[in-house]
Amino acid sequence: MSWFWVFVGFCLLIILHEAGHFFAAKATGMRVERFFLFFGPTIWSVKRGETEYGVKAIPLGGYVKITGMNPEEEVPPEHEANAYFRKPVWKRIVVVAAGPAVNIVLAFAILFGVYWVNGRPEVDQRVGSVQPGMPAAKVLQPGDRIVAIDGKRFPQASASERLERFAKTVGSHECAGKQVDGCVASTPVKIEIERNGATKTFSVYPHYDKEAERALIGFSYGQKMATLGAGAAASEAGDAIWEVASGTFHVFTHLFEEEQRKQVSGVVGISDVGHQVIEKGLERALLLLAFVSLSLGLVNLLPILPLDGGHIFWALVEKLRGRPVSLRVMERATMVGIAVVLMFFFLGLSNDIGRITGEGFEVR
């Protein structure tokens, strides 16, 4: 059943994206010939007015066909005034940008709703879990509140800063000699906790962890939900969108770095994550839907044809030049763009296969 909802979620995002193009085209006086979900052979269609609506067989996207969007297209004289390339540049940009804009606005709306209703998760000063076999397992229990480490309380720091300083204090205890994985620190950490209303103090010797590159005692903090007002929820949603946008930009501008290439994911990977997330509850499913919608909007704004961003880019070039770009240039730009899109597709597919099976296409 979870796979069904993943499919429904993807369909919803595609429909809303194309609906953005559709309604913007109608609002700017363009003629829309088709509004289809998916590609390939037609499964079902119906015509209402001048537009044919339908569903095709291959679930890899959707499209809105606007009269005159192809420069080589022969437009009947009666539809000439409503053709895409007969409209001013600003109207074309509005129509093309409307699809990604809907995805970004939808992402913001979902994030705002989730943060406003459920609040924001914050790290709690209480122990969430204790790692078996580590020093903390001998003295700490889930629910214990950490009061001080080595007598340090950091009362002026925020909750997250205080916990980070606690961790650095523990990490300052080093093994005698060379720091090797699993070695025991030469000095103990004094932990002051509050348990059932009573204060207790324990001393434990941290173990050096090679991966963390510092000494640890082996516990993690719990989480609590901080209530947010409408303004704070909107700010949190905006911050999340900015973080994803800047991260996406960083990945695409550093694709020659192997670690960044590994961040690219495709339909298979997103579907697999969606399947797992939906089983963990509505909130996580909504958050995933928001971030997939945001990614769909951002990726479509990349300035390469046939993506929406490519159409926006060449419309701006036309505006700056004062005349349309030649058909030959547009064709070459489209060929390059399709090659880049296919590269992203196969790179994402390779990474997805690698994550699921441990093997990929070894793109290096």
Label every model-predicted segment.
Residues 26-107, 225-228, 315-324:
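Membrane-embedded helix-turn/re-entrant segments that form the catalytic/gating core
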Residues 44-47, 126-131, 230, 315-332, ...:
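Membrane interface segments of multi-pass transport proteins and intramembrane proteases
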Residues 17, 55, 99, 300, ...:
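Divalent metal-coordination and catalytic microenvironments
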Residues 334-352:
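Final/C-terminal transmembrane alpha-helix of multipass membrane proteins
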Residues 253-258, 293-307:
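Transmembrane alpha-helix interface/packing and boundary motifs in multi-pass membrane proteins
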Residues 74-90, 98, 102-268, 358-364:
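PDZ peptide-recognition modules
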Residues 281-298:
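Small-residue-enriched transmembrane helix starts and helix-helix packing motifs
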Residues 19-24, 101, 105, 302, ...:
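Active-site His/Glu-centered metal-binding helix of metallohydrolases
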